[in-house]
Amino acid sequence: MISWLDIYHVVSATVPLYVSMTLGFLSARHLKLFSPEQCAGINKFVAKFSIPLLSFQIISENNPFKMSPKLILSDILQKFLVVVVLAMVLRFWHPTGGRGGKLGWVITGLSISVLPNTLILGMPILSAIYGDEAASILEQIVVLQSLIWYTILLFLFELNAARALPSSGASLEHTGNDQEEANIEDEPKEEEDEEEVAIVRTRSVGTMKILLKAWRKLIINPNTYATLIGIIWATLHFRLGWNLPEMIDKSIHLLSDGGLGMAMFSLGLFMASQSSIIACGTKMAIITMLLKFVLGPALMIASAYCIRLKSTLFKVAILQAALPQGVVPFVFAKEYNLHPEIISTGVIFGMLIALPTTLAYYFLLDL
């Protein structure tokens, strides 16, 4: 059971994040220390340096040979289920005022519902409840986030950005359609069929170009290199006992240790540019909270039952899914300008209700 001392440790882990965010907000809104270009530069530094190095640090310090296959499968199944649910909802519900089309909303929903703040808030809260076993499980979940889900998230961001750019394939397809409509009465049936085949081929070529463009962007992203090198080094370290040279290790820690603080500072800078703290509006804020604290845990319960997780592993998997949204997806959303106002609202208010929400799920699991 959680004691008052444990609650103090949770608050101690949360308050510094709000301090960083508040400093960012005050420095931009009231002190006018940063221009919009400088704010964008700070966010880019976090996205291109701090987060990749933090990912490397987390992955390289985890033993890949002791990870739970059932936990990995359950985590993968949860992400798959949430994509299916979001895709089904978007077939019938078309949000207004958003960017990126349906793919953009799937990316945002995925960021909110199943990428929690496991490292900063999950460790103190769940370790207080379940001890060292919970810490070991959470370390594996953090590694999965950094190694798999952030990489996939970046690919989806790049794919969405590539789709938004005008392509020659799209222009050809549009021209072909206009000509077909103008001359439809004068063309024989065979020529119509040939043009339809040409249009389909043009669409296929356009899709391949978009995928290749997104892939090229992904493979030059620093986070891709950081995660790949991290898992290779973790394998060498835990199999052969190799250690990083001290100067390299300290250089990585120097930059990565401030990553989350800089991310929260960037969040504060973004808030300062908005007219309201609830930048996305009350309705969207409520939907965000439902995605985070209802849909995410519910789908983790379903996947945990399917994979047959048991005992502490089952409970920790569900409780970590009920943790508030992580700040890293906000950094990516701001970098790609895809609904950062929605994700920032999820981060801010999610951290405020983190402890009571987690305790509510804890008591439900003990019934």
UniProtKB/Swiss-Prot annotation:
Q: Does the keyword Transmembrane helix apply?
A: yes
Question: What happens on changing residue 320 to A?
Answer: Enhanced auxin (IAA) transport activity
The record's subcellular locations are: Endoplasmic reticulum membrane; Cell membrane
Q: Which Pfam families would you find in this protein's record?
A: Mem_trans (PF03547)
Q: What is the effect of changing residue 51 to Y?
A: Strongly reduced auxin (IAA) transport activity
GO (cellular component) term, any one: plasma membrane
Q: Does the keyword Ribosomal protein apply?
A: no
Q: In which tissues is it expressed?
A: Expressed in veins of mature leaves. Strongly expressed in pollen.
- How is this protein's activity kept under control? Auxin efflux carrier activity is competitively inhibited by naptalamate (N-1-naphthylphthalamic acid, NPA).
Q: Subunit composition?
A: Homodimer.
What is the designated name of this protein? Auxin efflux carrier component 8
Q: Which organism is it from?
A: Arabidopsis thaliana
